[in-house]
């Protein structure tokens, strides 16, 4: 489903950056208008990340206009904002396939285009990678430039500051563009500041600045005085003292929606020596009023009617697991003021909006800082509170050392509510929750629970919250529950599974929300079905009894087979010298690509038909 490019005559002339750079500078505002409209028309018909891209149209055009991409390296952080980049780099006609099975990748992806020099999806990686590229480019000696684009949210993460601190030390030739969309374009970001930015980025000022530093460095008695005076004077016009202290030459803030001004500033900055930081001010959702008004709702959108300006409401029906968690949080906080809920910038996605409003003193959004979130929770636990860390499976990977060193070793009662466990779908390889059971299962003192429905999820949240012997985790998927009735909250017996169906010869040991599919297969094959509930500790007694009374066992989980729950069953049986055939069904040993959850599960044989087929093929061997 491609759009009629004739409706976008200037954009039609810029199929790739080479064509873009052949356009006269005067045509760039018109190009930006058409690019923004093309983005609106395509995403509204197909779904995808939306508001961020609207805010980076002018920046994207200016960067490709000034820099010789793909020879020069352009690195996008996270990648939500890179749809205009994809449109301008030969992928315009495929943009409607983004995030779909066999379509364009949702983020910049090295295997997709030579213009995507770094595959991304998680935040705050761009400056570290860009620094490495800049060092490599310097040794190459071909005058290749490196530009990193990072947002005001992503730059708050520790990794970004670690990279800037290193860059300030080794002094590479690179540019970091800080895309700041937290503030609107106000009076202090107008003609004066744009003129100032072009002046400060010019060769004359740069030469005087560097020459002055060399002269002043030879005058010890006045060096510090001059340094402080320079900082004071510069602080009056630009808010860049922090970046200057890290060793960057700071330029800005400038209007990120003035494409011709950006081109002029970037041309000045391209040949500057040392690490540079350009601070631009943009508006998320720029050019589409509903997205400007509510950029959070329009961050990632389903298909919608742009004329109405409203997003389709969900059909209601079954609650999501995220909502089940959020409701449990509110219910628990109403009775227990010691509950402290923590999220690393995922309030909406984790179902915590209502909690944050009703219990603001018990709610902490620590920004994109997963490592800090976990150790902060450890401190709260030491202080006698009951911390709950709400975090996506894929982002918990970023805090693994803190989970071990700061929580588990000290046996602190921190509960992890792990959302998006298993297949998440359209965001692809970087966001699938494929590894959490594997990387948590090897940690001593951890209790790991995998609910099979929303009622089980509530009971496990209650169980983990009241477990005081160490850390616990409840791991649940993206999507809706099953409609299971919600029972009064009670603690489950730790490490005990439940037999859901008695069968013969074959026993299926289920971990998590594939239980309905497993139930269909068990009925067809007359197999015993067990909801194991706990990945750790395993119900060893039940497993050994099943091994003794059945000819074969099947483990089922939506996690990597390697190191997962099924591996734990294998280890137990081998340790006890129980020789029984075991089939482990789960995620294979490759990074799972994008597609709807249903498509991915079908492709991997994790729907009912696929599970049955895998079992029958295995039994026939």
UniProtKB/Swiss-Prot annotation:
Cofactor: binding details: Binds 1 Mg(2+) ion per subunit.
CDD domains xref list: TPP_DXS, TPP_PYR_DXS_TK_like
EC number: 2.2.1.7
Functional pathway: Metabolic intermediate biosynthesis; 1-deoxy-D-xylulose 5-phosphate biosynthesis; 1-deoxy-D-xylulose 5-phosphate from D-glyceraldehyde 3-phosphate and pyruvate: step 1/1
GO cellular component: cytosol
Necessary cofactors: Mg(2+); thiamine diphosphate
Pfam family of the protein (one): Transket_pyr
Gene Ontology biological-process entries: 1-deoxy-D-xylulose 5-phosphate biosynthetic process; isopentenyl diphosphate biosynthetic process, methylerythritol 4-phosphate pathway; terpenoid biosynthetic process; thiamine biosynthetic process
Enzyme class, broadest EC rank: transferase
Catalytic activity: D-glyceraldehyde 3-phosphate + pyruvate + H(+) = 1-deoxy-D-xylulose 5-phosphate + CO2
InterPro entries, per the entry: Dxylulose-5-P_synthase, THDP-binding, Transketo_C/PFOR_II, Transketolase-like_Pyr-bd, Transketolase_BS, Transketolase_C, Transketolase_CS
Keywords assigned by UniProt, alphabetized: Isoprene biosynthesis, Magnesium, Metal-binding, Thiamine biosynthesis, Thiamine pyrophosphate, Transferase
Binding site for Mg(2+): 152, 181
Binding-site list for thiamine diphosphate: 80, 121-123, 153-154, 181, 288, 370
GO molecular function list: 1-deoxy-D-xylulose-5-phosphate synthase activity; magnesium ion binding; thiamine pyrophosphate binding
Highest taxon, organism lineage: Bacteria
Sequence similarity: Belongs to the transketolase family. DXPS subfamily.
Subunit: Homodimer.
Protein's job: Catalyzes the acyloin condensation reaction between C atoms 2 and 3 of pyruvate and glyceraldehyde 3-phosphate to yield 1-deoxy-D-xylulose-5-phosphate (DXP).
HAMAP family: DXP_synth (MF_00315)
Name the UniProt record assigns to this protein: 1-deoxy-D-xylulose-5-phosphate synthase
Organism whose genome encodes this protein: Serratia proteamaculans (strain 568)
């Amino acid at each position: 489903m491609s759009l009629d490019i004739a409706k976008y005559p200037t954009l039609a002339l810029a199929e790739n950056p080479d064509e873009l750079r052949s356009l006269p500078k005067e045509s760039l505002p018109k190009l930006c208008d058409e690019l923004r409209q093309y983005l609106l028309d395509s995403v509204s018909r197909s779904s995808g990340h939306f508001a961020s891209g609207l805010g980076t149209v002018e920046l994207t055009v200016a960067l490709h206009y000034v820099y010789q991409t793909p020879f020069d390296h352009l690195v996008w952080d996270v990648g939500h904002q890179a749809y205009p980049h994809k449109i301008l780099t030969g992928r315009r006609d495929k943009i409607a396939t983004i995030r779909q099975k066999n379509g364009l990748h949702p983020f910049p992806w090295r295997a997709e285009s030579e213009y995507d020099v770094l595959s991304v999806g998680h935040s705050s990686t761009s400056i570290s990678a860009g620094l490495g590229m800049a060092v490599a480019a310097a040794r190459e000696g071909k005058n290749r430039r490196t530009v990193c684009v990072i947002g005001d949210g992503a730059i708050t993460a520790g990794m970004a500051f670690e990279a800037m601190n290193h860059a300030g030390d080794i002094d590479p030739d690179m540019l970091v563009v800080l895309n700041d969309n937290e503030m609107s374009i106000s009076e202090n970001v107008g003609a004066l500041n744009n003129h100032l930015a072009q002046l400060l980025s010019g060769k004359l000022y740069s030469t005087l600045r560097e020459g002055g530093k060399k002269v002043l460095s030879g005058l010890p008695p006045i060096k510090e005085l001059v340094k402080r005076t320079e900082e004071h004077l510069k602080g009056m016009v630009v808010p860049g003292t922090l970046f200057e202290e890290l060793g960057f030459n700071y330029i800005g803030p400038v209007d990120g929606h003035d494409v011709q001004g950006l081109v002029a500033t970037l041309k000045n900055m391209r040949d500057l020596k040392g690490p540079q930081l350009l601070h631009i001010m943009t508006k998320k959702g720029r050019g589409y009023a509903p997205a400007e008004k509510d950029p959070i709702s329009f961050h990632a959108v389903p298909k919608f009617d742009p004329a109405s300006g409203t997003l389709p409401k969900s059909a209601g029906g079954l609650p999501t697991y995220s909502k089940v968690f959020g409701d449990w949080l509110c219910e628990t906080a109403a009775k227990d003021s010691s509950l402290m809920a923590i999220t690393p910038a995922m309030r909406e996605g984790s179902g915590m909006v209502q909690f944050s409003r009703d219990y603001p003193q018990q709610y902490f959004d620590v920004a994109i800082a997963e490592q800090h979130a976990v150790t902060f929770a450890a401190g709260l636990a030491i202080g006698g509170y009951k911390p709950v860390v709400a975090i996506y499976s894929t982002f918990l990977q970023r805090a693994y050392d803190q989970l071990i060193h700061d929580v588990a070793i000290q046996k602190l009662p921190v509960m992890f509510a792990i959302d998006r466990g298993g297949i998440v779908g359209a965001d692809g390889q970087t966001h699938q929750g494929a590894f959490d059971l594997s990387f948590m299962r090897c940690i001593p003192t951890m209790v790991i629970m995998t609910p099979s429905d929303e009622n089980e999820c509530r009971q496990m949240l209650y169980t983990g919250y009241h477990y005081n012997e160490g850390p616990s985790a409840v791991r649940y998927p993206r999507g809706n529950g099953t409609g299971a009735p919600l029972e009064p909250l009670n603690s489950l017996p730790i490490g005990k599974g439940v037999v859901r169906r008695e069968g013969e010869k074959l026993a299926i040991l289920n971990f998590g929300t594939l239980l309905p599919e497993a139930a269909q297969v068990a009925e067809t094959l007359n197999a015993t079905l067990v909801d194991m509930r706990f990945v750790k500790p395993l119900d060893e007694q039940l497993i050994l009894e099943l091994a003794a009374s059945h000819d074969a066992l099947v483990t089922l989980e939506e996690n990597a087979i390697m190191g997962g729950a099924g591996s734990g069953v294998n280890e137990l049986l081998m340790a006890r010298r129980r020789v029984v055939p075991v089939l482990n069904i789960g995620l294979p040993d490759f990074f799972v690509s994008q597609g709807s959850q249903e498509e991915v599960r079908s492709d991997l044989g994790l729907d009912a038909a696929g599970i049955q087929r895998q079992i029958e093929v295995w039994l026939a061997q």
